[in-house]
């Protein structure tokens, strides 16, 4: 590698340029994940009509701190619900009364539970559980100051960081954050620690 000495003005310009890039990168992480592009609609919108109100509901007016212990308990309880695929999207009330659900129903119910308990920055995600899967899968991602957590009540009983996953797993296609809709433009960076505004 060749190193060329920089004059004092160039060093200052170089340092300022790096600082500006760092600041811009830091502020953009508070908007939405860089791998998601806002869209007006998704191919799932019509199918999701029964659960649209759940996704656009406000968080509990008195924000409470959602503990990882509580999340693990919710995941364990939802994981225990027998899996049964449904072509129809079930509301949280339907999942609770039927006591069977697919990944969509379990993830929507967890989304509703988290919002009712004051959690913000929660995304409902549709994508692939594994890159080779033929069918899509649904899960949640929760952005916190400690990092982004992956919440999958179909397969997991504990909270895990997105950054801990193999890039060939949990590949997002579309995401829903409140009334906002996103399309994934490329695979999630493995180092993502993003706080979305909601």
Regions found by a protein language model. Name each.
Residues 2, 6, 25, 29-198:
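A structural boundary/capping signal
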Residues 4-20:
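Bacterial N-terminal signal peptides that target proteins for export
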């Amino acid at each position: 590698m060749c190193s060329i000495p920089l004059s004092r003005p160039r060093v200052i310009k170089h340092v300022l340029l790096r600082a500006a890039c760092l600041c811009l990168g830091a502020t953009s992480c508070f908007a939405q994940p860089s791998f998601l592009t806002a869209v007006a609609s998704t191919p799932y919108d019509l199918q999701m009509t029964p659960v649209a109100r759940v996704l656009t509901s406000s968080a509990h007016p008195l924000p409470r701190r959602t503990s990882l212990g509580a999340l693990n308990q919710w995941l364990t309880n939802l994981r225990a619900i027998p899996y049964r695929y449904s072509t129809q999207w079930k509301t949280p009330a339907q999942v609770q009364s039927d006591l069977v659900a697919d990944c969509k129903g379990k993830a929507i119910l967890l989304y509703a539970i988290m919002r009712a308990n004051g959690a913000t920055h929660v995304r409902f995600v549709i994508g692939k559980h594994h890159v080779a899967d033929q069918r899509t899968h649904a899960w949640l991602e929760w952005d916190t100051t400690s990092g982004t957590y992956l919440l999958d009540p179909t397969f997991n009983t504990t909270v895990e960081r997105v950054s801990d996953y193999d890039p060939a797993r949990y590949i997002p296609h579309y995401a829903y954050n409140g009334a906002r809709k996103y399309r994934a433009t490329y695979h999630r960076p493995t180092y993502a620690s993003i706080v979305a505004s909601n």
